[in-house]
Amino acid sequence: MFVAWRDLRFARGRFVLIGSVVALITLLVGFLAGLTGGLASQNVSAVLDLPGDRLVLQQPSTGQPSFGDSTIGQRAVDGWQAAPGVDDVVPVGIVQGRATAPGAGSGAAGSGAAASGAAVGVALVGLPTGARSTPVTDLAPGRDDQVGLSSGAAADLGVQVGDRITVTGTDYRVAVVGGDAWYSHTPVLAMTPEAWAAADRRLGGDGAPTVLAVSGSPDWDAVGASTGTSAASPLASLTALETFRSEIGSLGLMIVMLFGVSALVVGAFFTVWTMQRAGDVAVLKALGASTGSLVRDALGQALVVLVLGIGVGMLAVVGLGALAGGALPFLLSPVTTVVPAAAMAVLGLAGAAVALRTVTSADPLTALGSNR
């Protein structure tokens, strides 16, 4: 990489420009990936934490299963509980509702909505006690007149353990305040199955569970067909959330398009770059340099620029993401930082490799202008 290092030292302005563009694209891709991850977490974290190997939803006569329309009758519950190979069946009810905190404790840090007595949107989740411990099942209260709140619900309502809140016209005492749990962008409020069924009926439902969290190794398809239900892994079940499908579909398409734009932009920069170095490359080839060594030299130079630009961009993503985490649903994890950075590096090198073809395949004498 003798020529590459000399070029990097003596053409600093060019490489600062290219590196800045790479850093800005990385910042855009990384920040969008973090925002997508944060929005996804606020959409589906409660579903992913349900205590089952697979989640069972009602199979409609037409179309795909949906959390919003699913109701599991007692016959289906009994069918899954009696199926060979089933270890545990946990009926879970999920419905959107609203809660108010008319008597928030003085020690709680109430939000503006809670302080004014306004209703707060929550996801009412009916959970039995004794299920396998997860962040969601740990919220389950022990009595029908109690509720468990996720940290987000407690913060929005401005309450703590021992305070009373009103849900669908009925008062409950807060028995548990747990970790972060979300369903369809609303914080989770856990109730006993009996209390949830009563709340669901007050909201116009029939009180039947929404989903079954099933553990074991039965014949999933056969049991599903006999009970009119559909079983899928928790991750695959996310497609049954309409908000998740539309949200992730649009944001994912934007990320893919940004990756494509990054490859084109980096490739265009390196195309102009290699055209400007055509004379140097031709001299090296005329002196006996192999095509492989020239490719390694150019790609090594591109890799240095990409690593520096991506590194600066990722540092900005981590810093801004940490600052924005309190105001935006932003997720900092290897999936939203390392994966986009690696993809940017691969796509950038691919663009640089395509840009090298016209020079590395040219005849040295022609590149030197011998035809003149």
What are these regions (language model features)?
Residues 45-96, 106-112:
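Membrane-proximal extracellular/periplasmic loop immediately following the first transmembrane helix
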Residues 283-329, 335-347:
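Transmembrane alpha-helical interface segments in multi-pass membrane proteins
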Residues 3, 340-372:
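C-terminal membrane-exit region of the final transmembrane helix in multipass inner-membrane proteins
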Residues 33-37, 254-286, 294-299, 355-356:
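A hydrophobic alpha-helix feature that marks transmembrane segments and, especially
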Residues 38-49, 63-65, 234-257, 315-339:
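Membrane interfacial helix motifs at helix-loop boundaries and amphipathic/re-entrant anchors
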Residues 92-95, 100-128, 135-198:
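Hydrophobic secondary-structure segments that place a key small or acidic residue at a functional site
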Residues 177-258:
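Mechanotransmission and gating elements of multispan inner-membrane complexes involved in transport
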Residues 1-29, 40, 372:
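N-terminal Sec/SRP start-transfer signal
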